[in-house]
A protein has these predicted regions:
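Sec-dependent signal peptide recognition
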Residues: 1-8
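A structural boundary/capping signal
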Residues: 13-505
Length: 505
């Protein structure tokens, strides 16, 4: 009887009631979902209500003198575009969106904060050169460098604009900076589910997932890619953020009054303290400008070409990066190496002379790679070994060990090669071999606190405490000269103290 009653009630629901029920299930604060509903039911009262609701959400944050009137003709949106923006499904490239639709999005987004930046109105790279760093529009500059088709550039800009409007619609008028931060993270990491690409993809093409168009098309991104998107959205919402670059990584930081929040873009935006990124090798974190973030995108593009052994294209990418980063030591090292691999020794030498023995900002020890190259302690093929893809299988690591050992037989003073060989032995849990290899480094160069720390740690593991204490004291002495005592060094000292209560620095 109950089943028959329910069936009767279901069959008695009118089409209008079904549409009403469907409408009340969608997010009342989502512009894109309201517009998508309107696109499906444009001739119904509830469809027109959805359009009005979408416009109301936009108008909340627009000045009264510039409200969008529902009576003004709004061209219908491409449903595929709206659905892709309001779901977790990756886009499969540019949709067939019309110029009229792009102009509509542009009108809806005209109140976003990035419209106050001079950089938003730049139309070519020549004009971009004159824009001050604090006036750069990150999205516009990146797309001018990356995308030749003007309409495609407009499409990607419109995509970011719609994302910003979605976030803004969920914020009250006069929202605090903290509220904006929370909503951007919620939207990027939970609603849209931007995440690190699957291993099957990133192993082959990891550096392509730094570029904004790829991020927008795929919903996948590595640290730089998602951080770039986060910064682009923050510019539209008037949320000041600072890009921070630990070695080989980037995240964004929110600083306001006494609040300091790190947004770790590879871990759904959670806060990790600075200490998480510091080590024996890294004593401080480098702050970057938005101009440098553009350059970092092209550093990663250069790495992609390098990975493909296309050294000429890598030089081109690094040259673009140089426009935005100047003669950044790490950038210049990578660019110089490409010239070296192309057989352009004189160009490479001129670059290397500028960065020889440089200590990267935040690092506890100078770069030895270029110094050894110029001392003929290694050749170009030996340098290449350090940058080849490293497999995780045991056979891959054993192959790497054999190649490094063969190269070090000919070039026994190549410090980076020795350090990499020790790391390979450690990957196989062969601490004895790793310790013996690092001792060779110590004989050549006893001023590297990182090597001294690892020697001390390995000595403790092998319970050769006397020799380990020598290296631990050496590491402490070298770091004390830099007024730096990392937590891992303190922990290692306490571990020695546990084995020998009489031990002290």
């Amino acid at each position: 009887m109950i089943v028959k009653t329910l069936l009767f009630l279901f069959l008695s629901i009118t089409p209008k009631e079904k549409i009403d029920t469907l409408y009340h299930k969608i997010d009342p604060y989502s512009i894109s979902k309201q517009l998508a509903f309107y696109e499906l039911y444009p001739d119904t009262d509830i469809g027109k209500k959805a359009l009005q609701r979408a416009l109301d959400l936009v108008n909340i944050h627009r000045p009264l003198s510039d409200q969008i009137d529902c009576k003004v003709k709004i061209p219908p949106f491409n449903p595929n575009l709206i659905i892709s923006l309001s779901s977790q499904l990756p886009k499969k490239g540019m949709e067939n969106i019309s110029e009229e639709e792009l102009l509509t999005i542009k009108k809806m987004a005209s109140h976003l904060h990035n419209r106050r930046l001079k950089g938003f109105y730049v139309q070519n790279l020549e004009d971009a050169k004159t824009i001050e760093t604090d006036q750069i529009d990150l999205t516009r500059f990146l797309l001018l460098e990356l995308v030749e088709d003007p309409k495609l550039r407009l499409f990607y800009e419109a995509t970011v604009d719609l994302m910003a409007l979605e976030i803004l619609a969920h914020l009250p008028k006069g929202a605090t900076l903290e509220e904006k931060l929370e909503k951007i993270s919620s939207y990027v990491f939970h609603d849209m589910e931007y995440r690190f690409p699957p291993q099957s993809i990133w192993v082959e093409e990891i550096d392509s997932y730094t570029l904004l168009p790829t991020i927008l098309d795929s919903r996948f991104g590595v640290c730089l890619g998602v951080s770039t998107l986060y910064l682009a959205l923050a510019q539209r919402l008037d949320l000041p953020l600072v890009p921070i670059t630990p070695p080989g990584h980037i995240f964004v930081r929110f600083e306001h009054k006494d609040a300091v929040i790190n947004i770790e873009t590879t871990a759904r935006g959670i806060h990790l303290p600075d200490s998480h990124y510091l080590s024996v090798q890294t004593k401080s974190l480098k702050r970057r400008t938005l101009r440098e973030v553009i350059g970092l995108n092209f550093m990663n593009q250069g790495a992609l070409y390098w990975q493909q052994n296309n050294h000429k294209k890598a030089v081109e990418a690094y040259t673009i990066a140089e426009k935005y980063m100047g003669e950044d030591p790490l950038l210049m090292r990578f660019k110089g190496l490409q010239h070296l691999f192309l057989g352009e020794q004189e160009i490479a030498k001129n670059i290397f002379e500028k960065i020889r023995n440089v200590t990267l900002e935040g690092s506890t020890y100078k770069d030895t790679q270029i110094d050894d190259l110029m001392l003929n302690n290694i050749d170009a093929d030996g340098i290449k070994l350090l940058y080849e893809k490293e497999g995780n299988q045991r056979s891959d690591i054993e192959k790497q060990i054999k190649l490094l050992e063969n190269k070090l037989t000919k070039f026994p003073k190549f410090r980076d090669g020795i350090f990499h060989l020790a790391g390979a032995w450690l990957a196989l849990n062969r601490t004895k071999e790793a310790f013996e290899v690092l001792l060779k480094y110590h004989v050549i160069d006893s001023q590297n606190p990182v090597v001294e720390y690892y020697l001390a740690a390995l000595a403790l593991d092998r319970l050769t405490l006397q020799s380990g204490k020598v290296h631990l004291k050496k590491a402490q002495e070298l770091l004390k000269q830099q007024s730096y005592t990392p937590n891992v060094l303190k922990d290692l000292y306490l571990a020695y103290k546990k084995e020998d209560p009489t031990f002290d620095f």
